[in-house]
Amino acid sequence: MALELLTPFTKVELEEERKDKNRKQIGILGGNFNPVHNAHLLVADQVRQQLGLDEVLLMPEYKPPHVDKKATIDEKHRLKMLELAIKGIEGLAIETIELKRKGVSYTYDTMKDLIEQNPDVDYYFIIGADMVDYLPKWHKIDELIQMVQFVGVQRPKYKAGTSYPVIWVDVPLMDISSSMIRDFIRKNRKPNFLLPKLVLDYIEKEGLYQ
């Protein structure tokens, strides 16, 4: 099985390989970010640190194949909340390629375009442990695994296995979801400490998720 658990030895190997190639190492964390919350930021930052990446890009989807459009607010709000969430955070940035392209977002198409635009970059595509099980169903997955290195975020007590090459990273568990935050707001419960204060202030100012 091409299953790899991140260890100090693995990290050294990755760093030595990067020195030889002298290429930028960029992580990608895609999502609807409806809204972005602290667990998103924790995952992005921990993967960046543990793999020694130059940067992790948070990439909002325009119209993902698996999300009901009715449940997704306008992309201008999701983008603004991302901008507020990463303000002043080193090593995190935003990639808007899918918002600019519009239409349904397939990872293969997005990464193909990014690689063509940035031939000197190696990309690490970050997914949750539960998503690893679904890799065989991803659009053009066999081509995609030749283009990017998948990074699986390990969850406590969750054992995932795959025949695809995945680097596993352990990240502290934060049981937070965007749907939980939206539900809090609909019930007039303030979701303090679940997302950055600047994001919560924006949600309240714009009257989102009411």
Swiss-Prot record:
List the residue ranges forming a coiled coil, or say none: none
Pfam families named in the record: CTP_transf_like (PF01467)
Q: Name one GO molecular function term.
A: ATP binding
Provide the E.C. number(s) assigned to this enzyme. 2.7.7.18
Q: Which InterPro entries match?
A: Cyt_trans-like, NadD/NMNAT, Rossmann-like_a/b/a_fold
Which superkingdom does the taxonomy of this entry point to? Bacteria
Q: What does this protein do?
A: Catalyzes the reversible adenylation of nicotinate mononucleotide (NaMN) to nicotinic acid adenine dinucleotide (NaAD).
Quote the HAMAP family the UniProt record gives.
NaMN_adenylyltr
Provide the protein name.
Probable nicotinate-nucleotide adenylyltransferase
Question: Which gene codes for it?
Answer: nadD
